């Protein structure tokens, strides 16, 4: 009977019982955890791996992000890992043998003040220096790329230009998770859902396994990829992470015919908008200012987001909001991720991505897998070590996202 059914996500991977031990246990079954498992198997031949997810596969931030993919970051370190990630995105549909609707429709980052203009042009030149495709567009050119933007001078924050990355775009987030899960499963990785980590087994300052709601699992190495709950996991392991967790809201509209050809982001007024493949408008804004782990936020953030969006896109004035939701973003003091070894031997961490987690999915998995396999960081994630908060070698990317950190 199963052979007669159409392909469905629940049939793309097995749901085994946990084994007593694994070479590597990855905590967190979202995009980063699944990508790490895939690259451990593909690049390093390590297949005795378990991915533990406390709920359903990719049901956390992977299911709640706004799917934007880009690499136009200012600093060399950020450009390096995000550009590597974008190049991996371009290869993955064929490599994973799964169409996750990767659409390179370009991303516009709007400038509304002279300060924005200067900073944007600086970022374009830095991108070019790092081999990242980037252009500076005048308001007239912005209108050509996205005709529905209001580029008039009669709005609060007139559009004075924009940076443009043509290779950037969006992808279907749940399909991305399914693609990684299926391929990792084919290589021998165990994907274990409804298995929450409640503690760690240690021999002195060395991790030897995890305690879970489905029993104790021994492990040669353990990697934390739990996004917003990373600080909770680190505390269970006996060390602290310099991150804070905030709610981040997003929303979608009802379905429309294709009207929005690209992705538009505005750091100044904190709104970003794209149109999904089915036709709904997908919007995000700034984080809620309070700390918390609730996957919901305050209504005033949505109100301010709507006001900004309607001013930039008058055509949206009569659109109806279909639903809103929230995710949990883990932010560092320099708005850059942590992909690193930890004070606990054989315990590794990937966290602090803030609002950039989805776009960094392949790059995070690629570099974390290397770090686990060799017990040394890849050159791309070496700058994102935990020790940078002691040495002061920070990578300040607060201006890189269209949200308030």
From Swiss-Prot:
<dbReference type="InterPro" id="IPR036188">
    <property type="entry name" value="FAD/NAD-bd_sf"/>
</dbReference>
<feature type="binding site">
    <location>
        <position position="62"/>
    </location>
    <ligand>
        <name>FAD</name>
    </ligand>
</feature>
<feature type="binding site">
    <location>
        <position position="31"/>
    </location>
    <ligand>
        <name>FAD</name>
    </ligand>
</feature>
<keyword id="KW-0963">Cytoplasm</keyword>
<dbReference type="InterPro" id="IPR006278">
    <property type="entry name" value="SoxB"/>
</dbReference>
<feature type="modified residue" description="Tele-8alpha-FMN histidine">
    <location>
        <position position="173"/>
    </location>
</feature>
<dbReference type="InterPro" id="IPR006076">
    <property type="entry name" value="FAD-dep_OxRdtase"/>
</dbReference>
<comment type="function">
    <text>In the presence of tetrahydrofolate, catalyzes the oxidative demethylation of sarcosine to yield glycine, 5,10-methylenetetrahydrofolate and hydrogen peroxide. In the absence of tetrahydrofolate, catalyzes the oxidative demethylation of sarcosine to yield glycine, formaldehyde and hydrogen peroxide. Can also use N-methyl-L-alanine and N-ethyl-L-glycine. Is very specific for oxygen as an acceptor.</text>
</comment>
<keyword id="KW-0547">Nucleotide-binding</keyword>
<feature type="binding site">
    <location>
        <position position="66"/>
    </location>
    <ligand>
        <name>FAD</name>
    </ligand>
</feature>
<feature type="binding site">
    <location>
        <position position="61"/>
    </location>
    <ligand>
        <name>FAD</name>
    </ligand>
</feature>
<dbReference type="GO" id="GO:0046653">
    <property type="term" value="P:tetrahydrofolate metabolic process"/>
</dbReference>
<dbReference type="GO" id="GO:0008115">
    <property type="term" value="F:sarcosine oxidase activity"/>
</dbReference>
<feature type="binding site">
    <location>
        <position position="53"/>
    </location>
    <ligand>
        <name>FAD</name>
    </ligand>
</feature>
<comment type="similarity">
    <text>Belongs to the SoxB family.</text>
</comment>
<keyword id="KW-0274">FAD</keyword>
<dbReference type="GO" id="GO:0005737">
    <property type="term" value="C:cytoplasm"/>
</dbReference>
<feature type="binding site">
    <location>
        <position position="32"/>
    </location>
    <ligand>
        <name>FAD</name>
    </ligand>
</feature>
<feature type="binding site">
    <location>
        <position position="359"/>
    </location>
    <ligand>
        <name>FAD</name>
    </ligand>
</feature>
<dbReference type="Pfam" id="PF01266">
    <property type="entry name" value="DAO"/>
</dbReference>
<feature type="binding site">
    <location>
        <position position="197"/>
    </location>
    <ligand>
        <name>FAD</name>
    </ligand>
</feature>
<feature type="binding site">
    <location>
        <position position="68"/>
    </location>
    <ligand>
        <name>FAD</name>
    </ligand>
</feature>
<keyword id="KW-0285">Flavoprotein</keyword>
<keyword id="KW-0288">FMN</keyword>
<feature type="binding site">
    <location>
        <position position="357"/>
    </location>
    <ligand>
        <name>FAD</name>
    </ligand>
</feature>
<keyword id="KW-0560">Oxidoreductase</keyword>
<comment type="subunit">
    <text>Heterotetramer composed of subunits alpha (SoxA), beta (SoxB), gamma (SoxG) and delta (SoxD).</text>
</comment>
<protein>
    <recommendedName>
        <fullName>Sarcosine oxidase subunit beta</fullName>
        <ecNumber>1.5.3.24</ecNumber>
    </recommendedName>
</protein>
<feature type="binding site">
    <location>
        <position position="354"/>
    </location>
    <ligand>
        <name>FAD</name>
    </ligand>
</feature>
<dbReference type="InterPro" id="IPR001763">
    <property type="entry name" value="Rhodanese-like_dom"/>
</dbReference>
<dbReference type="GO" id="GO:0000166">
    <property type="term" value="F:nucleotide binding"/>
</dbReference>
């Amino acid at each position: 009977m199963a052979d007669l059914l159409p392909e469905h996500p629940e049939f793309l991977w097995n749901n085994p019982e946990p084994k007593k031990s694994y070479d590597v246990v990855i905590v967190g079954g979202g995009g980063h955890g699944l990508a790490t498992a895939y690259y451990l198997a593909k690049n390093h031949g390590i297949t005795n791996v378990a991915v533990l997810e406390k709920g359903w596969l990719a049901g956390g931030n992977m299911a709640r992000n706004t799917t934007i993919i880009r690499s136009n970051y200012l600093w060399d370190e950020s450009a390096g890992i995000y550009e590597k990630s974008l190049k991996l995105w371009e290869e993955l549909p064929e490599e994973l043998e799964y169409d996750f609707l990767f659409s390179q429709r370009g991303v516009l980052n709007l400038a509304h003040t002279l300060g924005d203009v200067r900073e944007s042009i600086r970022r374009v030149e830095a991108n070019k220096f790092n081999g990242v495709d980037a252009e500076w567009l005048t308001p007239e050119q912005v209108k050509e790329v996205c005709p529905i933007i209001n580029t008039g001078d009669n709005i609060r924050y007139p559009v004075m230009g924009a940076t443009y990355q043509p290779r950037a775009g969006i992808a279907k987030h749940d399909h991305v998770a399914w693609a990684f899960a299926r391929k990792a499963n084919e290589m021998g990785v165990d994907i274990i859902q409804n298995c929450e980590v409640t503690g760690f087994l240690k021999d002195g300052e060395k991790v030897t396994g995890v305690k879970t709601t489905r029993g104790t699992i021994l492990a040669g190495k353990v990697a934390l990829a739990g996004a917003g709950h990373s600080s909770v996991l680190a505390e269970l392991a006996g060390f602290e992470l310099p991150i804070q967790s905030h709610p981040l809201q997003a929303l979608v509209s009802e379905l429309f015919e294709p009207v929005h050809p690209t992705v538009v982001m505005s750091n100044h007024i904190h709104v970003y908008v794209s149109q999904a493949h089915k036709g709904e408008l997908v919007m995000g804004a700034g984080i809620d200012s309070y700390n918390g782990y609730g996957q919901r936020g305050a209504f005033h953030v949505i109100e301010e987001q709507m006001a900004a969006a309607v001013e930039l896109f008058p055509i949206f004035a009569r659109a109806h909001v279909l639903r809103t939701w929230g995710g949990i973003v883990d932010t560092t003091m320099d708005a850059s991720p942590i992909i690193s070894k930890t004070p606990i031997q054989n315990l590794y961490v990937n966290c602090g991505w803030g609002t950039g987690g989805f776009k960094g999915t392949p790059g995070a998995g690629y570099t974390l897998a290397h770090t686990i396999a060799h017990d040394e960081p890849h050159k791309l994630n070496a700058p994102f070590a935990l020790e940078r908060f002691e040495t002061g070698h920070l990578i300040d990317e607060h201006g890189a996202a269209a949200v308030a950190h």
